[in-house]
């Protein structure tokens, strides 16, 4: 048994939403065994480790549901060593579980990546745990492809992805390319979250897709129709719904004011902060690559040769800090956006996503500026400052 003391714990209140509590000790092994008032653990003479958090925040481990790569590795490398590298780097940023994200490439390459992810799902964690895949493309709109390769865009066909239904947890699709609701219904019946993204849909089409079961929005505002007072677009449909909306809070993909507008429009709920990072994340300025396309990184901006934004170089803990600066949102509410909300959406909240007795011992420990102190995955410390 191990213990964490002298921290500010982010825990569920009586409504289920998060609040901060001091004066508690957290006892754990591979699971959270107890959360008690400090001093009540004195009888545990068998404690093998006691960590003094020194007044830092102790939160559930973060979930990153949209990440292509980091530290020189990419999901489309379709290589177990690449996923291990991503897992270790993600743990440094407070992430304890994530969805390696594919992109629009030859489907044979996507299939290879999905098989590699399947293997990682059932293997031992080497840092952050691989939960499955976010499949971004190839079922998208050519006019909103962003940094995806238009040559490999395909019409949506559930039979194409059915062999990988156990691996795909979220799939991004342009709803205007669907002839009916059959694809959305088939995905949801197999436990796959359908996300609206890379889409030129109008408001009515997007709103219908949400009603049909597409309850997730891929990187809100980016690669979709925007808000106009006579044409509300996908953005309007997303804001006027309970769909969970991904946000890339690097101040490149979303202006600070837009982050604040979205936060208030959604009443602080149904938001999931992501990175959408590429392999250049963590490597600094210079040339990189995304799906065979040349990328240049300068500061926080990653672009293709034509100037198209090509994902981010954002670390998730930095995104939380930026979002707090821009919105003034309370830290417990921000933590819900990378724990409780995605865990509930993925059907995993009974296992992860909160500091609750019996759940997996996944922790992110950080200071007021979201600088990481320690990351614990399944009771094992994978990062410490």
Regions found by a protein language model. Give the residues of each.
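Divalent metal-dependent hydrolysis catalytic cores, especially in the metallo-beta-lactamase
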Residues: 68, 84-113, 128-141, 165-176, ...
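Alpha-helical scaffold segments that flank or form the walls of functional sites
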Residues: 56-57, 65, 75-127, 151-164, ...
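Conserved, mostly hydrophobic/aromatic
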Residues: 135, 187, 217, 323, ...
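Active-site gating loops and adjacent loop-to-helix segments of metal-dependent hydrolytic enzymes
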Residues: 88-99, 142-165, 208-220, 231-244, ...
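His/Asp/Glu-enriched, well-ordered alpha-helical/loop segment
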Residues: 237-247, 263-275, 280-359, 363-366
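Active-site core of metal-dependent hydrolases
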Residues: 165-283
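N-terminal metal-binding scaffold of metallo-dependent hydrolase/deaminase domains
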Residues: 1-44, 376
């Amino acid at each position: 048994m191990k213990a964490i003391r002298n921290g500010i714990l982010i825990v569920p209140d009586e409504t289920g939403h998060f609040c901060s509590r001091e004066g508690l000790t957290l006892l754990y092994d591979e699971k959270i065994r107890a959360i008690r008032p400090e001093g009540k653990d004195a009888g545990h003479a068998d404690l093998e480790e006691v960590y003094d958090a020194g007044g830092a925040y102790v939160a559930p481990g973060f979930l990153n549901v949209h990440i292509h790569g980091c530290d020189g590795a990419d999901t489309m490398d379709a290589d177990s060593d690449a996923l291990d590298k991503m897992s270790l780097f993600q743990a440094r940023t407070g992430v304890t579980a994530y969805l390696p994200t594919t992109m629009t490439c030859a489907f044979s390459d996507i299939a290879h990546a999905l098989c590699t992810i399947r293997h990682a799902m059932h293997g031992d964690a080497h840092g952050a745990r691989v939960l499955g895949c976010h499949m971004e493309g190839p079922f998208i709109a050519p006019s909103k492809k962003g940094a995806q390769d238009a040559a490999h865009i395909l019409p949506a066909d559930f039979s194409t992805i059915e062999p990988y239904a156990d691996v795909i947890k979220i799939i991004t699709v342009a709803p205007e390319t669907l002839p009916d609701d059959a694809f959305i219904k088939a995905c949801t019946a197999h436990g796959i979250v359908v996300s609206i993204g890379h889409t030129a849909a109008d408001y009515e089409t997007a709103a219908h897709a949400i009603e049909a079961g597409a309850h997730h929005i891929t990187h809100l505002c980016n690669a979709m129709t925007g808000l106009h007072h006579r044409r509300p677009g996908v953005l309007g449909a997303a804001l006027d719904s309970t769909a969970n909306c991904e946000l890339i809070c690097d101040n490149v993909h979303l202006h600070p004011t837009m982050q604040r507008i979205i936060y208030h429009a959604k009443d602080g709920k149904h938001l999931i902060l992501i990175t959408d990072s590429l392999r250049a994340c963590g490597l600094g300025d210079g040339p990189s690559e995304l799906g065979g396309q040349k990328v240049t990184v300068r500061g926080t901006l990653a672009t293709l040769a034509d100037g198209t934004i090509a994902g981010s170089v954002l670390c998730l803990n930095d995104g939380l800090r930026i979002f707090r600066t821009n919105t003034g949102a309370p830290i417990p509410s921000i933590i819900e956006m990378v724990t409780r909300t995605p865990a509930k959406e993925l059907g995993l909240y009974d296992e992860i996503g909160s500091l609750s007795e019996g759940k997996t011992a996944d922790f992110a420990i950080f200071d007021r500026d979201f600088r990481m102190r320690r990351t614990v995955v399944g009771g094992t410390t994978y990062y410490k400052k």
